[in-house]
Amino acid sequence: MPTWTEYIFQRKLGRAPSPGDVVEVVPDLVGFHDLTGYHVLEVLESMGKVEVFDKGRVVVAFDHLSPPPTQRAAEIMVYIRKHVKALGLPNFYDVGGGILHQIILEKYAMPEYVIFAADSHTNTAGAVGAFAHGMGATDIAAALKLGRTWVVVPAPFRVDVRGEFPPGVMGKDVALHLLKQFGAEGFNGYSVEVFVERPKAFPMDDRATVANMSTEMGADALMFIPDEVTADYLQRERGVSYKPPSLEPGRYVDRYEVELQRLEPLVAAPYSVDNVKAAREVEGVEVDQVFIGSCTNGRLSDFEVAARVLKRGRAKARCIAIPASYAVFRRAMELGYIDVLTKAGCVVTYGTCGPCLGGHFGVAGPGEVVVTTSNRNFKGRVGHPDSKVYLANPATAAAAALEGKIVDPRPYLAP
């Protein structure tokens, strides 16, 4: 019987490919953002008449340079807007709309979809069981014009998740645990398929975090096998009915088991995503700035946890909080999370990638220590090359903001 990866490709190709095969696939969705969109459209222009295969299958979002921090960024946005208007693309999200990956997850991604976008964290949509894969500008331009592009069929790797999250542990810690076990290139050439033993114990927001950070693991894709949580999410968020197919277990090149109860809050210390330690091992490291947000941890439950911690007082470190989409921002406001964060001294804004890539809205200075819920911590990632970046879950990040140093977040989540 097929694995989930094989099942998706069989439906697309009408045949069963083997790992390593180079195949042409018709995508269900193609996306790009402001930082990559300029290059995508340049390539599209070089191919002759500027046109797309299906306007309804294209998603464009301004997120990396949003709102534009430089004149050049503003020029890029003007250029992209002109093309979006000329092409008549309906799924366009201008400044304030949110981060591309979150928008795709909220509004468009479906189980069994094949999604290609011009960004490495396209994998995020694997949270709902889509084969979502990042590509370069040339390949995305070809997909936009021709309605198809090539992909190497990855080998399937199975991960079984058992148990429930203990207090203070979140999807980010599952991702960091996998990075510690397999390294930053451990899943190169693999499509990771995650089976959750107790689906309701692993919410969609946490699934999105793990899928997002599979990029850091080298995975071509990471997909949570659709279950009742997937179906509930699609019904609640979009009013779409979905019944997960019943598949017999397929054959995997390897497998690994994660026991959630055995995990604790983790951090990735400078300067590598797989330099993973328990948060308690680095307690006391003084922190200058905290960032809660990004396509990794900018969802509603992330801000609920951050608010639970920061309601205890005013942050001692600079704190920047950025919901990943307008929808998350609005809901966080309605539930009072934004009020708690601003009272704690956090600077809050609409969805932007700015601090994550060291572009704007929170660039780190020389020697500064940053705790962030984003996905990368190599030298210079969030600003000055002499800054130090720790990756953490939202509870750990919020506790670091509150105390001005890294601490174990679990005591701060007690009632």
UniProtKB/Swiss-Prot annotation:
Any one Gene Ontology molecular-function term assigned to this protein's record: 4 iron, 4 sulfur cluster binding
Catalysis performed (reactions): (2R,3S)-3-isopropylmalate = (2S)-2-isopropylmalate
Keywords in alphabetical order: 4Fe-4S, Amino-acid biosynthesis, Branched-chain amino acid biosynthesis, Iron, Iron-sulfur, Leucine biosynthesis, Lyase, Metal-binding
Cofactor note: Binds 1 [4Fe-4S] cluster per subunit.
The protein's role, per its UniProt record: Catalyzes the isomerization between 2-isopropylmalate and 3-isopropylmalate, via the formation of 2-isopropylmaleate.
PANTHER family in the cross-refs: HOMOACONITASE, MITOCHONDRIAL (PTHR43822:SF2), HOMOACONITASE, MITOCHONDRIAL-RELATED (PTHR43822)
Family to which the UniProt record says this protein belongs: Belongs to the aconitase/IPM isomerase family. LeuC type 2 subfamily.
The protein's name in its UniProt record: 3-isopropylmalate dehydratase large subunit
Native organism: Pyrobaculum neutrophilum (strain DSM 2338 / JCM 9278 / NBRC 100436 / V24Sta)
